[in-house]
Design a protein with these regions (language model features):
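Active-site beta->alpha loop and helix N-cap motifs at the rims of alpha/beta catalytic domains
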Residues: 2-134
Length: 134
């Protein structure tokens, strides 16, 4: 029988912005609010977190900030999907190196992949990442 990799309720966080970029004080408040109320995991840089509109560097900076703030209290699941398999692999590896406990990987959204292509995409990311992939 398989073991559950995550249990309970995970919250997909928004990424707050100001006109100058990510609003890190507001992000910390959001995290504290969720942690104080007993969430079991946080999901960062997913669809709700504006990942598709953020640069690679912005995504990594947000993932690193969330991992630091959470400080091991709950699992951090990092959105590391990308339209390009190589980019998804690189972002996944970097997110794991930053301390992410799991990865949220979206289906490539621009090119229409075959079923075989999708399996190859997800397998390549999962094999490279060494953490659970959702």
């Amino acid at each position: 029988m398989k073991q559950a990799i995550f249990t309970g309720s995970g919250v997909a966080l928004v990424t707050p912005f100001t006109s100058g970029g990510v609003d890190y004080p507001a992000l910390e408040k959001l995290l504290d609010f969720q942690l104080d109320r007993g969430t079991d995991a946080v999901i960062v840089c997913g669809t709700t977190g504006e990942a598709a509109t953020m640069s690679y560097a912005e995504r990594m900076a947000v993932i690193e900030a969330v991992v630091r703030r959470v400080d091991g209290r709950v699992p951090v699941i990092a959105g590391s999907g990308a339209n390009c398999t190589e980019t998804a692999i690189a972002l996944s590896r970097d997110a794991v190196s930053a301390g992410a406990d799991g990865l949220l990987v979206v289906t490539p959204f621009y090119n229409k992949a075959t079923q075989r292509g999708l399996v190859r995409h997800y397998t390549a990311v999962a094999d490279a990442a060494e953490k659970p992939v959702i």
